[in-house]
Amino acid sequence: MGKGDPKKPRGKMSSYAFFVQTCREEHKKKHPDASVNFSEFSKKCSERWKTMSAKEKGKFEDMAKADKARYEREMKTYIPPKGETKKKFKDPNAPKRPPSAFFLFCSEYRPKIKGEHPGLSIGDVAKKLGEMWNNTAADDKHPYEKKAAKLKEKYEKDIAAYRAKGKPDAAKKGVVKAEKSKKKKEEEEDEEDEEDEEEEEDEEDEEEEEDDDDE
């Protein structure tokens, strides 16, 4: 595979990624000619991050927020080259893919493993979780599989409604109504004034749906 589009906006970085970048720059200044053991370096960064106060982390969190805003702004104006037109900017309001049974299992046991073995790397933690899952009896896996199936079913309904109407919560109002809304929108696309009115209505709908979710 070749390199991606060089004009594509650089991906957004997390607060921890900014912290690691800063650590790397500090290390280079102190030891410009020394080679870096990535595994050992990552471990030290992780340990240092855990001991930092919320105030100390705040600087990096602000950097991450600013970078996220930059990324979203650039992606709105980014036009992918031919052949990549299907790769659209990921809508933050789109329904999130449901976790697998194994992922749910990991979410529950990862904190326990980290607590018992604080020195383990991310890779080692993942390996240990994989071994635990493989050694778990089918009956014990069942609750995770059942929950994952329910989440998958909900996701399929939400994504169908989202694709029809363009809103993640449209399933509450039904897919049929969502399709009517889409048709209405297409008919009004040529009339700018009506299109503006429709956008205002959509915003009101979203606010109402968010209120429903909060209840």
From Swiss-Prot:
Q: Where is this region: Binding to AGER/RAGE?
A: 150-183
Q: Where is this region: LPS binding (Lipid A)?
A: 80-96
Q: Where is the short sequence motif Nuclear localization signal (NLS) 1 located?
A: 27-43
Region of interest: LPS binding (delipidated): 3-15
Q: Where is the composition biased (Acidic residues)?
A: 187-215
Localization of this protein: Nucleus; Chromosome; Cytoplasm; Secreted
- Keyword set for this entry? Acetylation, Adaptive immunity, ADP-ribosylation, Autophagy, Cell membrane, Chemotaxis, Chromosome, Cytoplasm, Disulfide bond, DNA damage, DNA recombination, DNA repair, DNA-binding, Endosome, Immunity, Inflammatory response, Innate immunity, Isopeptide bond, Membrane, Nucleus, Oxidation, Phosphoprotein, Repeat, Secreted
Q: Which cysteines are joined by disulfide bonds?
A: 23-45
| PROSITE patterns (alphabetical) | HMG_BOX_1, HMG_BOX_2
Could you describe the subunit structure of this protein? Answer: Interacts (fully reduced HMGB1) with CXCL12; probably in a 1:2 ratio involving two molecules of CXCL12, each interacting with one HMG box of HMGB1; inhibited by glycyrrhizin. Associates with the TLR4:LY96 receptor complex. Component of the RAG complex composed of core components RAG1 and RAG2, and associated component HMGB1 or HMGB2. Interacts (in cytoplasm upon starvation) with BECN1; inhibits the interaction of BECN1 and BCL2 leading to promotion of autophagy. Interacts with KPNA1; involved in nuclear import. Interacts with SREBF1, TLR2, TLR4, TLR9, PTPRZ1, APEX1, FEN1, POLB, TERT.
What is this protein's record name? High mobility group protein B1
Organism of origin:
Sus scrofa (Pig)
Question: What lineage does UniProt assign to this protein's organism?
Answer: Eukaryota, Metazoa, Chordata, Craniata, Vertebrata
